[in-house]
């Protein structure tokens, strides 16, 4: 049975598809230029909107480069940030901007990778030029472009695309009818494809068969829980967090795939007695968090959220103070690559050696 709204949005989706394909054709035929960066570029992005596990993969790649002695920089758009233009989030020694100024995901990457330079800019080319100008004395070995599969104005040494296997990817429709930014055939631009959020390997089989026809290297990964971090009171500590199975909680989040958050908690034995969800990147207000706190207090529940939501609130410390009178935790996740890790590592090393 067809969704009436979907049918109404279909003409707009067809129009969007035509525009996307025209733009890509112009880049493919070099009628629109792609700038060559003086620093090697690794792009990590996806074909769909949100929920692919991109940020944990960016974090994994940054940590891998650091582990082999490379100095990575991260350039992100900083979605829903309050600042404008090119902004230095971290100079690789100190985080300089709040999450409200840099965007929640970018702040999370900066705090979790203190040795990496992090910049936000809508125009990534301007961010690269800023980096080259201001960090000539300690130039990064590689620049990681976050969420840049569609950002074709910059050439890249390695183009990584992520697919969320838990969603009906092969039948997904284009924006605004569906969640796709580009049609599936545009995966041909990818040098490497990461099949992510694989909980059931059989679910990935149809996508694997479709993609293998292209001959693009495939990596298989899942999102795993790294730790539960307590941020009640004045401290932040994973050591203070109790076993997950002992927690009865109100879960709240403003992410694109809230059900995956609940599923992760459920698999670890957390009892979710209530939940409150908001749209992705939605700013928290004192009113919303007061309502959440009062519900948790009346039911005797702990509060648990995502790491991204924690960093979004961190930009406004007065908001965190509203809820931390109760036990509060955030769930830290990571990318677990269970097939093809050596291929990914080899291609990451090769990208740096290209210049």
Curated annotation (Swiss-Prot):
Keywords (A to Z) from UniProt: ATP-binding, Kinase, Lipid A biosynthesis, Lipid biosynthesis, Lipid metabolism, Nucleotide-binding, Transferase
GO molecular function: ATP binding; tetraacyldisaccharide 4'-kinase activity
Regions annotated as coiled coil: none
EC class of the enzyme, as a word: transferase
GO biological process: lipid A biosynthetic process; lipopolysaccharide core region biosynthetic process
Pfam families tied to this protein: LpxK
Pathway the protein takes part in: Glycolipid biosynthesis; lipid IV(A) biosynthesis; lipid IV(A) from (3R)-3-hydroxytetradecanoyl-[acyl-carrier-protein] and UDP-N-acetyl-alpha-D-glucosamine: step 6/6
Binding site for ATP: 48-55
Kinase is among the record's keywords: yes
EC number per UniProt: 2.7.1.130
SUPFAM superfamilies in alphabetical order: P-loop containing nucleoside triphosphate hydrolases
Catalytic reaction(s) noted: a lipid A disaccharide + ATP = a lipid IVA + ADP + H(+)
Function text: Transfers the gamma-phosphate of ATP to the 4'-position of a tetraacyldisaccharide 1-phosphate intermediate (termed DS-1-P) to form tetraacyldisaccharide 1,4'-bis-phosphate (lipid IVA).
Protein name (database record): Tetraacyldisaccharide 4'-kinase
Organism, as annotated: Pelodictyon phaeoclathratiforme (strain DSM 5477 / BU-1)
Name of the gene encoding the protein in the UniProt record: lpxK
